[in-house]
Every structure is written in structure tokens, then in C-alpha cells.
Design a protein with these regions (language model features):
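Catalytic alpha-helical scaffold of carbohydrate-active enzymes acting on polysaccharides/glycoconjugates
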Residues: 1-160, 165-231, 249-271, 278-321
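Positively charged, amphipathic and often flexible ligand-engagement surfaces
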Residues: 234-236
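Extended hydrophobic-aromatic, low-complexity segments
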Residues: 240-241
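Helix-loop elements that line ligand-binding/catalytic pockets
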Residues: 244-245
Length: 321
């Protein structure tokens, strides 16, 4: 039987993933708390042998604004809605990690890179949105080239990519492969995402699925698409939501049942979240993650489940042919 695999990935973006919809003052506590939680997560991963992919926005590789600007593409994303572009923020946010810790994160990049089993991946250079009107595949390619260039000049070879908000269309997968990526994380492949297009209902069903098995078990066999491995996200680890706090036990039970199903059937289960998701109520979230990864230890012992980061999983799959 195939070996079962647990993949963990994190969308490492600081405030760049929120700047188009939030004021920093509204979310700063979460971002700064997420920064403080990263060493705790790395220690948790070390204790349980968890190999994870940290998909970082390219801006985080820069030590300061001057260094970052040298990598700005000549062709920037042409979104119809200009607030979507992070480039508009420069000049008003501070120039380095000391003055703008919600926007710069080079010290965290170095911390992650030094930890065993942790892979640095890409969350695009500018937190690029592939489904927004006005942008083009050529602009997307320019963004990816910038992301790989700033990382390569600092000794990092990025081969795994997670697209912001999981926005991917078929014409973008060959662009990712041509840019040098071998793995990406697509959005959950279930009936909610495929058939429900009315956004209020979609949000309700996605929230309910956190606690109840509306969409099945989430395990799968990864596929190669145009030379790039699609490592679909199985489950986002959702942060504590106070109005439904009494259902937290169901949330953890749901994740563990999905992990068990994957372990028993030789499938891949891909768990993901953002560091800022655990930036408030951090100790509660760390206790929950400890419970999840202690359960992984049991599945490893009983069923031989493995922990691989996205790059490791993709290499294994591509080498098998």
C-alpha cells in the first residue's frame, strides 16, 4: 500500500495579505502575535518531527525598502482595483523590520531557514492575486521571477508556491512551472468550492465544514499537472472563533478523523494556516496544534504516516515518474 503523508504549509505574509481590506490598527495585534508565535511553532514542529513549508511573500526577504526596490518587476500587476497592489504601500509604512515589523520579516526568514525540515516556499513576490480583473499572466510571470530572484540572491532556491487566497486558474500552472516551481497548493477540491457560487452561502458552508463532515475526508493522491505537482489543501486549521467556541472539540475531532482516514488508506492530508491565525489566543492554539501533532505521532507509529514538506513530497512524486 502507498505510504500516507501529512503535509503542513503556512501562508507567511505578515500584513501583506490584509492590507487591501483592513487598517493595520485593526489587525496589528494578530500580526505581531503571529511573529511571536513562529518560534513556538518551530519548536512544536521540532518535537514532533513535522516538516513544513513556509510560503513567504517575496517582500519579506528584503532587509529594507531600498533592497526590495531593486527587485520590483518592470511590469507591475494592473489590477482594476488599485488598492489590491501592495506596491502602493511603500513610502508610508517604514523602511525596515525595526520600523515596520508588520511588513518586513527577514529575521523570521532566517529563523525558519535554520530549522530542520522546514522549507521556504513562495507566496508570490507581492501577494499577487491571479483572479483579479486587470492583471495578466505576463505580469504574474514577472512577479514570480522577482520572488525567485530575491530569494536566490540570498541562497534560497524556491520550488514550492502557494498562491494568495488559493487563486489559481488552469492557464497559470504552466507559468509557475516555467518559472521554476515544482509544487503548488490548490484550493480544496470539494462540492462546496465547485458548486456553490453565492458568497454568503459559501461562507456559511465553509464554516460549518470546519466542525461537521460536509465535504468528506480530504485525503487524496497528488497529481502532476504540466510538470508541477498539485498538493491540494485538505483542511485549513481555523483559529478560535468565540461565537462558536463551544464547538472547538468538534473542530479538532474533524481534523483528526481526516488524518486517520488518510493514514489508513495511504493518502495525503494537507493541513495549512497563516501564522497570524494564531497571533491572538496563542497558547490555546498551540495547545490545539500540540494535540493534532501528538495524534500524528500515533498515526506514524500505527500506520507509518510520514511528514513531508511540499518540496520533499514533490521531489518524491516527480522522481517516481
Amino acid at each position: 500500500m502507498r505510504e500516507s503523508t501529512l503535509i503542513v504549509s503556512l501562508d507567511f505574509e505578515l500584513f501583506w495579505g490584509m492590507q487591501d481590506g483592513w487598517e493595520l490598527s485593526e489587525y496589528e495585534e494578530n500580526i505581531l502575535g503571529g511573529r511571536a508565535a513562529i518560534p513556538k511553532m518551530l519548536e512544536l514542529f521540532r518535537r514532533h518531527g513535522i516538516h513544513a513549508t513556509w510560503a513567504a511573500v517575496g517582500y519579506l526577504f528584503g532587509r529594507n525598502e531600498g533592497e526590495l526596490r531593486r527587485y520590483f518587476p518592470t511590469e507591475l500587476p494592473g489590477y482594476d482595483d488599485p488598492k489590491l497592489s501592495g506596491y502602493r504601500c511603500f513610502g508610508s509604512i517604514g523602511t525596515d523590520e525595526g520600523s515596520a515589523p508588520c511588513y518586513y520579516g527577514r529575521s523570521l526568514i532566517d529563523l525558519i531557514a535554520a530549522a530542520e525540515g522546514q522549507e521556504l516556499g513562495s507566496h508570490t513576490f507581492s501577494h499577487y492575486y491571479c483572479r483579479e480583473p486587470g492583471q495578466t499572466t505576463a505580469q504574474f510571470r514577472a512577479d514570480l521571477d522577482a520572488a525567485r530572484a530575491i530569494a536566490a540572491d540570498q541562497g534560497f532556491d524556491l520550488t514550492s508556491i502557494i498562491l494568495p487566497r488559493n487563486q489559481c486558474e488552469p492557464e497559470y500552472t504552466p507559468v509557475m512551472r516555467e518559472a521554476g516551481f515544482t509544487a503548488y497548493r490548490d484550493e480544496e477540491n470539494d462540492w462546496i468550492h465547485e458548486k456553490i457560487h453565492f458568497k454568503p452561502l459559501l461562507r456559511i458552508l465553509r464554516l460549518a465544514d470546519v466542525y461537521l463532515p460536509l465535504t468528506g475526508q480530504g485525503g487524496y493522491i497528488p497529481k502532476v499537472e504540466n510538470g508541477i505537482v498539485n498538493l491540494v489543501g485538505s483542511r485549513m486549521y481555523k483559529p478560535f472563533f468565540k461565537p462558536l467556541g463551544f464547538l472547538e472539540g468538534l473542530k479538532l475531532r474533524r481534523i483528526k478523523k481526516q488524518m486517520l482516514h488518510a493514514a489508513k488508506n495511504g493518502l495525503t492530508f494537507h493541513l495549512w494556516w497563516h501564522p497570524h491565525n494564531v497571533g491572538v489566543r496563542t497558547e490555546l492554539h498551540m495547545q490545539q496544534l500540540e494535540e493534532i501533532f501528538s495524534y500524528y505521532d500515533e498515526l506514524k507509529e500505527k500506520y507509518g504516516m510520514r511528514s513531508l514538506n511540499m518540496g520533499e513530497a514533490a521531489r518524491e512524486i516527480l522522481n517516481r515518474g
